[in-house]
Amino acid sequence: MMLLKRSNDNIVLSPIMNRQNRQNNRQNSTKKKPFIPNNQDRFRSKHRDSSRMDPVDNKTLISFTSGKPNQEKSFSHDTGTNKYSSSKLSETFTQTKPNNTDKFRSKYSKQRYSENHKILETISRSHSTILNVDIKDNVELLNQLLSFNKESNQQIPNNPSVPKRVYFVLDKSSNQTDKNMARITDDNKSNGLSIENNSDFVNMILPYVSGAIKNIRVKPWFCSMIIINNFHMENKYFVMILKLWTCYYNIWKKNKKIPEPPKLVTITNHYDDTISNLLPSNTSSFTLDKNSCYTTVVYDNESENLSIGSKARYQRAANIAKHYSDLYRDKSYNGTYVIFVPSKKEYLIVKKHLESIITDKSQLKRIVVTTKFPTEYGISVVIDTMTHYYSDFNMDQESSQTLGWISDNTSKLRRNVINKYSGGIYVVMQSEINYKTFCTKSMTNNFSIYDIVKLIRHNIDPEIIMDDIMDQIRLDSVLIFLKKLGIINANNQLTVMGRFCLEFPLDLRKSAMIYHLYNNGTPNLMLYILVLSVIDNYGSGIYVWPKKEDNEDLIEYTMRIDDIMLELEDKFAGYSDVDTLFNIWTTIAKYGNPLNVNYVRKFCDDNRLNFSKMRNAINLTKDCLDVFSENSFNVNLNLTNFDQPYGKTFYKILEITHFDSKIVVSYDYFKHKTIAYHNDKECCIDNRAIHKIDLGNNPEKTYYALSHNRYTTFTEDDIDIINVLHALPDSDHETQQDFFPD
């Protein structure tokens, strides 16, 4: 039996890296990414009401109105945490105040300077600060923050002449606001500012939290200040950054021997207790209430009885847009109108109805229907259907989209797109009573299984970080699954197999399959990796089907597709879809190198296979082989003796790793089609699959669903289709032997 190769009884592992990172590391071998850590005792800070000053918790609250720049509603601070003296702060403002008076001729210049002064005072007195301001309109504040950082005592160790950098954390995959902010701050990179994506920044701070929890020596932090821009609760990475920083801060408060954490500045457009509850109790806050026109909220009671997925609900949104467009055609609120819809399906419903009820093209052009945050300026009216598709990641890291009501955080984000200087109308397609009932403060539910494993890898108890931000039932189900799969042990610590699986670019299940295959010395291991890589990229299929021609009726087109399917079945069909994939790769390997892209391209062109999917599978396989090489695992890449029981071996591994992926298949005589039931959900079987399974013949047979997708039909109904099935012929069930004895 071939075992994992070890060094000093420990597997040598490299940091978690995805496929893109691995390719970048090949090109830039000298560039090192920060390491990552995890684990700690539970520290629950007392969360108090942030709307008032609490002398016990030393809360700092500043509220300031721009219309009266010299008037201060309330101001208090904790002198015990004031590391930077007032004189130094004054010096900072003296040095950073521009000499060019032409720049400050606007009526807001002195007012803004006073605002920034108070913001910096707030930041100087606390490790954590929440700014309820809009920083993208205040570039001067960024410059003063950088100057404030230079004047402070936060320098790089062993190089006191160089100050630590300020990290500006953005969601670069989000809306245009953060992209604009990235361009604005790009000029300040040489002035001590670094811009980082929020997901990458989580990996950067994990080592510090892990070291603090394990009570080992922690290096000084790589930055002196963290600025999170446009924070909102729907962004899981922003939430994790706050929780990780708070975890480290609580440990530092009890053990001052570890390095002091950087200051944390959280910038948001809608501050409430939901944010402050994630941070220490002595967090400061600053609210800038500008003299701007405010948004009028209108509740549409007629939408109350329209169901969340009904076509009438989204047609109603179009009718509301027409109503306000006619009402304010030449008056106020004549800017851009935005209708928020959950997906492309609802987008088409609204657009089609708008075109049928509005004939004026200029009026129609002003109405923007979107599933994301709009980039248009001058928005006057927002019509919110109050719906969205939220991602619910399963154990295979596949995201299933579920239609649901939005949370109050999302509602605030959508309302904030209205022009704050001219004001506008925010139409809620629900009654006020129902809105307050279902639009509640929800936890962030889009955490994936890898977010949990990442914490466990660094010895961080997931419950410490995920407390109050992830549903406890879901967290428990993830931990139970990881234990069944063998990724973690009973003490929630990574096993040898768990560390092995985290190295692979495949998901945890498929990586566990590779582990069992390798550990048992299975011949032709590379063929299994190629098949799993194809399944990972399968999507709607790997076969190329011709399009229907203009002069071809549906019957002729169907017959042409049937002829192509018969041709593919004659060449490659196995008993199951998995057997078919093995036949394809075995044929490729018999006559050439399966990792040669040019050879595989020609093979795909000759056999109606999707080269793009096959090329992705080859690249993924190469990444897997790189992991074997990097960790000094001996893998025999020679493909010999192709006559192997691939299907039986594959099925036996599925019993270990895909214990919850079994489906029940039966024939529905009323609908005249085969129906599959997966986790109590009704699915269809891909009718263009190439296999020999008689799906309606044996309802007692065990099937494994390995790839499925959701499609929208011509009738605008959503259906789930299983694309890859695996099962054993009845004869193989009778002669099956134990390939992996305990």
UniProtKB/Swiss-Prot annotation:
Residues 18-28 have a biased composition (Low complexity). Residues 60-69, 77-99 have a biased composition (Polar residues). Residues 48-57 have a biased composition (Basic and acidic residues). It comes from the Viruses. Residues 1-102 are annotated as: Disordered. This is Uncharacterized protein L581. It comes from Acanthamoeba polyphaga mimivirus (APMV).
